[in-house]
Amino acid sequence: GHELAGIVESIPENNKNGIKVGDRVVVDPYLYCGHCYPCRIGRTNCCTDLKVLGVHVDGGMAEYYCHPADMLIKIPEGMSWEQAAMAEPLTISLHGIHRGGLQAGEYCAIIGAGPIGLVAGMVAQAYGAHAILLDLVQERLDFAKSLGIEYVINSGKEDPVERIKEITGGEMAHQVMECSGANPAIRQTFDLVSNAGRITL
């Protein structure tokens, strides 16, 4: 797992975040080298030797886990463990929304109704935008509707281009967020975005 939180059992006293034994923390799950060109310019997400917890290295599905001290973030008092575990999907969704410059009143098409896509839809609506969530799995879309997502499209049952054209009055989506990682979905972003619109991957 890479969406995890825990209690610090041991940590160097001189860590940069001022974390102490007993603190509740979330982790930055993306382990980067710190030396390659992307790392040197602050784009650690593009590290040439990037390792992701739970994907490339063992993650948080264990009672104890060792992680670099400078990649721990203290969580506030009163935050539940369940809320803390959502820090990673929330930050990814927020980053995509911010990078795309989403504004209130705009339409945001989000491809993929997994954790990132669902949170992105809720964030878009919290910003006052209209979220349009696309997926092939009806159960995910039903769950999205139960969370209050304004529009859902089952891409396997209806034409997303025509449906988004209908929803937006012909303008198409002002921002398209691709949250599935599937090659056909990445290509489809170009069909869903408005003229002068933005795509975030």
What residues fall within each predicted segment?
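NAD(P)H dinucleotide-binding glycine-rich loop of Rossmann-like/cofactor-binding domains
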Residues: 31-111
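Residue-level marker of beta-strand positions
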Residues: 3-7, 24, 38, 64, ...
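Mid-domain Rossmann-like dinucleotide-binding core that forms the NAD(H)/NADP(H) cofactor-binding site
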Residues: 79-158, 162
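Glycine-rich beta-strand-centered segment in the early N-terminal region that forms part
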Residues: 1-37, 76-78
